[in-house]
From Swiss-Prot:
One of its GO terms (cellular component) is cytosolic small ribosomal subunit. InterPro entries: KH_dom (IPR004087), KH_dom-like_a/b (IPR015946), KH_dom_type_2 (IPR004044), KH_sf_prok-type (IPR009019), Ribosomal_S3_C_sf (IPR036419), Ribosomal_uS3_bac-typ (IPR005704), Ribosomal_uS3_C (IPR001351), Ribosomal_uS3_CS (IPR018280). Transmembrane segments: none annotated. It comes from Bifidobacterium longum (strain NCC 2705). One of its GO terms (molecular function) is rRNA binding. It comes from the Bacteria. This is Small ribosomal subunit protein uS3.
Length: 267
């Protein structure tokens, strides 16, 4: 009991969108679905390692036939871009070597870092690495998030807190954090702090309010209108059983209409 599902995966397709936008049904080596999944994971790991101090919130990957588009959302775009774009060019060259395709690198700035759960988790982890008391780091993150307009925040730390011999978990919550409400806009972030006592896991949930009725219906309409999705322009499958009865019933409905004029001519 008490196990928490990832809020991002739980609301995927409802209030959250995919962060890898592509599809592959090829059997060719290097272009298979599993190859792209592994490549996406490698891209995210390399970016997180190289841009650890840049405050990367999320990375969105979109693929076409001959190009890979990588969108980096960061709180410190100056570190990612570098002097005269040198750092961005280095990152792009590294991604092109990894993927073997042309890479389009886009850098977006996160306007309010206090409301981004991933950035809040990274901030707490940095303070723990710098030997700041964990309760003080949690309290400061809560206050900053609530001042920025959050409806609620929940922070959980797990590990050897304060250098204790036995590991434990502590969490603080302020406001409302409805994890079971699908329309709730909840941002989730996780980061590990590397301290002298070991690693401390930091989890952050931030509640930003509920999605309105009009926004919810609009997003559902966009999901249903996608080609190849249910409710959209979907082609019938081969051997579809539902189409067979309709084809069999069609001639039966036309037969009485043809017999009616023949009965009138006899009279």
């Amino acid at each position: 009991m008490g196990q928490k599902i990832n809020p991002f995966g739980y609301r995927l397709g409802i209030t959250e969108n995919h962060r890898s936008k592509w599809f592959s049904d090829s059997n060719k080596a290097g272009e298979r679905y599993r190859d792209f999944v592994l490549e996406d994971d490698q891209i995210r790991k390399e970016m997180s390692k190289d841009l650890e101090r840049a405050g990367v919130s999320r990375i969105v990957i979109e693929r076409t036939r001959d190009r890979v588009r990588v969108d980096i959302h960061t709180a410190r775009p100056g570190i990612v871009i570098g002097r005269r774009g040198a750092e961005a060019e280095r990152v792009r060259a590294k991604l092109e070597k990894l993927t073997g395709k042309q890479v389009q690198l886009n850098i977006f700035e996160v306007k309010n870092a206090a409301l981004d759960a991933q950035l809040v988790a990274q901030g707490i982890a940095e303070q723990l690495t710098n030997r700041v008391t964990f309760r003080r780091a949690m309290r400061k993150a809560q206050q900053d998030a609530m001042r920025a307009g959050a409806k609620g925040i929940r922070i959980k730390l797990s590990g050897r807190l304060g250098g204790a011999e036995m590991s434990r978990s502590e969490f603080y919550r302020e406001g409302r954090v409805p994890l079971q409400t699908l329309r709730a806009l909840i941002d989730y972030g996780f980061f590990e702090a590397k301290t002298t006592y070991g690693r401390i896991g930091v989890k952050v949930w931030i509640y930003k309010g509920d999605m309105t009725e009009s926004e919810f219906e609009e997003q559902q309409a966009q999901q249903n209108n996608r080609p190849g999705r249910r409710g959209g322009d979907r082609r019938p499958r081969r051997g579809n059983r539902s189409a067979a009865p309709q084809a069999a019933e069609a001639p039966k409905a036309e037969a009485p209409a043809e017999a009616a004029p023949a009965a009138e001519t006899k009279e």
